[in-house]
């Protein structure tokens, strides 16, 4: 059991300081350097006399200095707000306005001028890290203090800052390092999701708490397929953490196999639906690896349920289940009135437990809408639909806000995409609606990245896909039009950009 995140990482630095904590394509830093840098930064932050507990924004990409800044902030008693360097200027401005940070640490050069709060620019930050300082931790983030605040994109309007406490983080990290995942110590762990996406916590937290090495994959490398495919085998990975969409990109390379990545033993997925197609490809190509599907919203600290996906699971489930809830947490499946539904019936996932956030920063109205108390414990209403069978296994049924109605039929977009991917002609798929002038759905479209094939015309490929799926898909779920692309657009978080595709097909992009 972890009692204190900061102390445990520092203890590794004191006992085995020469271990590599961070490897950014050969630019390495040890645990001793992580402690030294974060200590020096914490001492500097203390000297600024910032308001007690006020958050600190940390801006940058996949760099060691980001992690060191996170730890330096929390050692000095301040939560950090991670902001990725690929963020739009407007998002940066929104986060400054809503989050009200007392300080901005710029690991990379800021794209806008910030005058409302003090800024530590990259040059000054380097000087602080180089100025080794002995630091005594006396007022760190602990207990219910916020450890980090991650801003979600939100379905509409301004982003919301999800507050995650030290206690929330420990609940998650303890689970990741439990027997449920058999996370080996001193592993080589892929660090690909941006730190502004809470999936990144699934790599850095258990890695740094288990004497492991984070193998950073900068966005520039991940976005260039040729460079990505050449880089992955050189990382000597043991543990892979990403969205399923990023794994689908890697699977486009026929050399992404156990033979070329022999030490890879764990795939951990979260953030979007894992299809049976993707899971089967991974099991076939990596026979020595275990594929874990996990589920959870940012508001409940990354993930709260999971299970290993085996051949037996694939054979007995049309869609990949999202697992069993972790032992310190309760999941209820409820109707719109907040009443529990019978086992096997669809309802909203409501999460109750020690990893549930206290709410949205400086946004009591949205907090009151999404959070509630159940038997004296904090609970979060996810907006995700699921069923729970008699064994406690959760089966995801989609987002309540990604359902459409076409010709009187209710259609779940993610379900259509999953069924499309069962065709061996389809590498990746998304289903998107086209609306008429009155906002009513008039057509369902499929956006496809095709597998290698010998068809000369798109119509031949479309007919072949439809023929393969005619016994799987209900006729009303078959898209009326198929659009083919070389690659799917992804959000900065590595998920398929479904909202962007919807805007594109409706002429709003």
PLM feature segments, named:
Residues 210-212, 237-241, 251-317, 321:
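Gly/Ser/Thr-rich phosphate-binding loop
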Residues 56, 73, 146, 152-155, ...:
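Conserved S/T- and glycine-rich ATP-binding loop of Class I adenylate-forming
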Residues 69-77, 169, 206-208, 482:
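Short hydrophobic alpha-helical segments of the AMP-binding
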Residues 1-149, 164, 275-279, 327-330, ...:
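AMP-binding/adenylate-forming domain of the ANL superfamily
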Residues 134-151, 158, 183-189, 195:
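Conserved pre-ATP/AMP-binding loop-to-beta segment of ANL
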Residues 60-63, 84, 193-197, 220, ...:
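Conserved AMP-binding
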Residues 160-190, 198-238:
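Conserved AMP-binding/adenylation subdomain of ANL enzymes
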Residues 4-6, 104-114, 118-139, 169, ...:
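AMP-dependent adenylate-forming
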